């Protein structure tokens, strides 16, 4: 199934299934009927975040040049229309639109390879499970991983299939359920290309259906070298905090 998925998905080498699945992490949300922004405030409080000024919230502590740093958590809360999450404090907003339906995009101050996008698309589905299995859903959003642009003959070397210059490995796949019973599909992949740039790129993808009949997708990309130099903490903190109402 994994091989068929990869061939249909983005013409790369087979996606390797993980040997085991990690324990699901429950994303908790407030059970009371409160506004989206109030819910985020409660969530941020639970995460022990110190509130920042508007400039800090938009640009992180690096923008706080006239006073001492007040946010020591490394994250700032963000409340969107229908979703909420914690953003790495030193990431900046970006106006690029990598994919259709992007409603939020942030990128690392130091390396734009590291970025986060939130996508919202209208759907007639009521829950993420209505899209089918996790494999089937990943296939349907394979455009998020990019397409192979090169066309030509190559040898089967370096872990790449013949005539392929990119490959993806599925490192982890899981489902999580929040306090309100909403289910999320979550994936972690490592995508490599023949040029060996950054040793590959880690891709975190999460998805669920909101109460407003929209499919919400979060995608976080981190270069492999930066992943192991501390960016993993930023990526996972944002990824695990993603909540849809």
Swiss-Prot record:
Note, other: OEE2 is not necessary for the accumulation of the core PSII particle or for the accumulation of either OEE1 or OEE3.
UniProt GO molecular function: calcium ion binding
One GO term of the biological process aspect: photosynthesis
Family label: Belongs to the PsbP family.
Signal sequence extent: none
This protein's name: Oxygen-evolving enhancer protein 2, chloroplastic
Transit peptide residue numbers: 1-57
Gene3D superfamilies per record: Mog1/PsbP, alpha/beta/alpha sandwich (3.40.1000.10)
GO cellular component: chloroplast thylakoid membrane; extrinsic component of membrane; photosystem II oxygen evolving complex
Keywords, sorted A to Z: Chloroplast, Membrane, Photosynthesis, Photosystem II, Plastid, Thylakoid, Transit peptide
Subcellular location per the Swiss-Prot or TrEMBL entry: Plastid, Chloroplast thylakoid membrane
InterPro entries named in the record: Mog1/PsbP_a/b/a-sand, PsbP_C
Function: May be involved in the regulation of photosystem II. Required for high levels of photosynthesis oxygen evolution.
Source species of the chain: Chlamydomonas reinhardtii (Chlamydomonas smithii)
Listed SUPFAM superfamilies: Mog1p/PsbP-like (SSF55724)
Pfam family, any one: PsbP
Main location: plastid
Bilayer-crossing regions: none
